């Protein structure tokens, strides 16, 4: 039976366009991993969607004079279109205004309350006397109580990453009017996370976390405290039996992974299909997030699941990225440090962008996109190594009338066998990189394989042998080079799928209509017995230029 694999990535907030930082950190890694697991023949479900509630949305919608639903509709469509332009292999792109979400969120809350994990408390919150209302976190800014950053948001500091309650800010002010805020008593529901410390520590021991964040998560759980999960807002999911209150966005948003799967199942005509991934055994669940979302995905959401009667699937691996910068600075459209996605893709191929973002992904530390690095990698790696290897072999074969190559008609020498073993080892290395969620290492292996193919072709020098009349030896060299190209297409497909399919089409004996690396024909290549026993046939076609030089 194929392994069931559930993949989710942090829901993009319906409050602005996606930029390269979002793509490189979270969404490209999730897409690459989904493609890789499908190549293995696994039963993969990849769910994402828009996060459509929260204070930041109401703030910006008010500024733009738009209704809240109109505002999130606009950005939901933009996000969905962006994912499609980037070729992401999603099974379903949902949203937290989907028809299943509100009821499920309220049910989560009711079960936590019935389990004694929710209690209402009267506490001091920030109040604007000018606006005559309590202001929830994103309506507030002030000085961070940890690092002293003087424009910290009301729920987390964008400078040091600390998260806290808005009441903890020093010198808090309204983001609407700029007036100083006062403290005033009000009532909210609190999630008693401190009562779940032992259960959370036990859970996190069995969950994959990158080394660079594990200590943070364990420390967070050790010092976890109750959190207010309600807000005084009109836009949000109403809290049962608590008039005037809606759920805090970080209580409702993670439940969107489940409600989004419900919506997917309904769209397939099988409303219970979601249970196969969330309630049945034998599922591997991998979640891709940015480090700024870490407390909510590693602590709050697992705690919410642990407090339910239904045994919802808990995450097995949290893949956490650092920040991705543009020329050393944070992406900011308002400050002009921004790349327009549509304009960029009108000038450069999608595979060029995917490759460079993968090669520079912020996996264990902050990294950056620079146009000089983009140009250098495209020209030296994609054109100079990868594309050059494909083109020179196929151009030589076409010029000298080699259009069919078969294992059964060639005689391999020791140098060929040694080369093929190196090729197979690099394929194993690539699989290891993908299993360990490292796009950077995978791109390095891809280029190593292309470089190996170039070195082999140079050393064998078939153009010299052809002059000596040893046509049969040239056929063996071309066979080995094409075998290398086929495996190069396989291991590069998760990252540069268009180019990989183009290679496949140029050497595969299958028809173009059926040429897809997601077929079992490709999946079998991962199996050790296929890697170790060559039984191939290649039908060569005219070479097509995969990559052009970036000026």
Curated annotation (Swiss-Prot):
Alphabetical keyword list: Aminoacyl-tRNA synthetase, ATP-binding, Cytoplasm, Ligase, Metal-binding, Nucleotide-binding, Protein biosynthesis, Zinc
Biological process per Gene Ontology, one example term: methionyl-tRNA aminoacylation
Cofactor, free-text remark: Binds 1 zinc ion per subunit.
Domain of life: Bacteria
Signal peptide limits: none
Cofactor(s) listed in the protein's UniProt record: Zn(2+)
UniProt feature coiled coil, ranges: none
Residues engaged in binding ATP: 333
MF terms in GO: ATP binding; metal ion binding; methionine-tRNA ligase activity
One GO CC term, this protein: cytosol
Motif 'KMSKS' region positions after renumbering to this chain: 330-334
Locations listed in the record: Cytoplasm
Residues engaged in binding Zn(2+): 144, 147, 157, 160
UniProt short sequence motif 'HIGH' region, positions renumbered to this chain: 12-22
Enzyme Commission numbers on file: 6.1.1.10
Gene3D superfamilies (alphabetical): HUPs, Isoleucyl-tRNA Synthetase, Domain 1, Methionyl-tRNA synthetase, Zn-domain
Catalytic activity: tRNA(Met) + L-methionine + ATP = L-methionyl-tRNA(Met) + AMP + diphosphate
EC top class named in words: ligase
Similarity field: Belongs to the class-I aminoacyl-tRNA synthetase family. MetG type 1 subfamily.
UniProt function note: Is required not only for elongation of protein synthesis but also for the initiation of all mRNA translation through initiator tRNA(fMet) aminoacylation.
Subunit: Monomer.
PANTHER family in the cross-refs: METHIONINE--TRNA LIGASE, METHIONINE--TRNA LIGASE, CYTOPLASMIC
Protein name (database record): Methionine--tRNA ligase
């Amino acid at each position: 039976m194929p392994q069931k694999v559930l993949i989710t990535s942090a829901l993009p907030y319906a409050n602005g366009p996606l930029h390269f930082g979002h793509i490189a950190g979270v969404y490209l890694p999730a897409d690459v991993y989904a493609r890789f697991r499908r190549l293995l023949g696994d039963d993969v479900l990849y769910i994402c969607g828009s996060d459509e509630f929260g204070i930041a949305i109401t703030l910006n919608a008010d500024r733009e004079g738009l209704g809240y639903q109109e505002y999130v509709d606009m950005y939901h469509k933009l996000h969905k279109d962006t994912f499609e332009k980037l070729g992401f292999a999603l099974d379903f792109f949902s949203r937290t205004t989907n028809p299943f979400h509100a009821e499920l969120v309220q049910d989560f809350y009711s079960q936590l309350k019935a389990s004694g994990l929710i209690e209402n408390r009267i506490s001091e919150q920030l109040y604007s006397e000018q606006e005559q209302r309590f202001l929830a976190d994103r309506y507030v800014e002030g000085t961070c109580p940890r690092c002293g950053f003087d424009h910290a948001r009301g729920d987390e500091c964008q400078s040091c990453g600390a998260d806290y309650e808005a009441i903890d800010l020093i010198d808090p002010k309204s983001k609407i009017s700029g007036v100083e805020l006062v403290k005033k008593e009000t009532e909210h529901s609190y999630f008693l996370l401190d009562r779940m410390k032992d259960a959370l520590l036990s859970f996190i021991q069995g969950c994959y976390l990158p080394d660079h964040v594990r200590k943070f998560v364990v420390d967070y759980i050790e010092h976890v405290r109750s959190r207010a999960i309600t807000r005084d807002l009109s836009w949000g999911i109403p809290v049962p039996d608590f008039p005037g209150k809606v759920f805090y966005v970080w209580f409702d948003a993670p439940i969107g992974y489940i409600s989004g799967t419900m919506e997917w199942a309904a769209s397939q005509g099988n409303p219970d299909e979601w249970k196969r991934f969330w309630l049945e055994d034998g599922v591997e669940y991998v979640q891709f997030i940015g480090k700024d979302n870490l407390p909510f995905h590693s602590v709050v959401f697992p705690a919410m699941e642990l407090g339910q009667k239904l045994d919802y699937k808990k995450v097995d691996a949290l893949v956490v990225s650092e920040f991705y910068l543009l020329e050393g600075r944070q992406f900011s459209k308002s400050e002009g440090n921004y790349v327009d996605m549509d304009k960029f893709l009108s000038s450069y191929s999608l595979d060029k962008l995917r490759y460079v973002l993968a090669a520079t992904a912020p996996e264990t530390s902050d990294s950056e996109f620079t146009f000089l690095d983009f140009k250098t990698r495209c020209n030296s790696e994609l054109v100079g190594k990868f594309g050059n290897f494909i083109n020179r072999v196929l151009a030589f074969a076409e010029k000298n009338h080699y259009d069919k190559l078969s294992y059964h008609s060639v005689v391999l020498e020791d140098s060929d066998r040694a080369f093929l073993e190196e090729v197979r080892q690099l394929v194993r290395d690539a699989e290891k990189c993908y299993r360990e969620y490292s796009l950077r290492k995978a791109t390095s292996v891809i280029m190593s394989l292309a470089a190996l193919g170039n070195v082999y072709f140079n050393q064998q020098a078939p153009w010299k042998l052809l002059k000596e009349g040893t046509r049969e030896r040239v056929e063996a060299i071309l066979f080995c080079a094409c075998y290398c190209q086929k495996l190069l297409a396989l291991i590069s497909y998760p990252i540069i799928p268009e180019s990989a399919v183009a290679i496949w089409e140029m050497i595969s004996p299958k028809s173009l209509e059926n040429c897809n690396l997601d077929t079992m024909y490709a999946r079998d290549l991962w199996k050790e017995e296929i890697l170790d026993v060559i039984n191939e046939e290649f039908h060569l076609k005219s070479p097509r230029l995969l990559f052009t030089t970036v000026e």
